[in-house]
Amino acid sequence: VLAAANQPLVDVISTSFGAIGSIPVPGIEDATKVAVVDKHKLHTGAADNSPSPAIQDATAGPPWSIGIAGYAEEGDDQKEIMSGSYPDISADWTQYLPNHDDIDGYHETSGTSFATPRTAGIISYVLQNLRDEFADNGSGASEERGGMLVSGNNFTISNAQVREAINLSAWYPDFGWDPTSGTMPISPVLPCTQTGWGLVNLSNIEPI
């Protein structure tokens, strides 16, 4: 993580490891703090694949990190039971991947380790589009760029502004729970305790 933090070409760091049950083991948060607070990058951290509180997780919990839980996109759009509670935001946690033990099959696999890089990918897409639009040919948030992730023609964007846009673009789904799906219904009362700001949504970011 520190190597990525100190690499000027890196914009976003995504990590999907941590102690089982979100036991607050110290260490990684020191490195992610350097990356975000000192080097002005963004960090997405996977919540545990359990209902444990993401806020105590060393990867997903620090205030400078974006803690990611999972939801069932293209399913019932509800909260996955086996992903952390009290995250910052939630993303689709299911991927359709080739089998590892044959050459012609596919399977679905799930976890916050998929939801987290998916969120990082959305952030990267947003950054690249802004750089293209405002003629910014650089990358990273080095001191030469004033600590800005985007520094173009009369236009700058910081890591805090990108994070705010991601938060504001999120949405809460309507109640449509399938009790056989392995999810839990997102409560209309304090849904933030289950999904944080909501479900990450690229299409909502563009107008912001």
Regions found by a protein language model. Give the residues of each.
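Short Gly/charged-rich anion-binding patches and loops
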Residues: 30-31, 54, 84, 161, ...
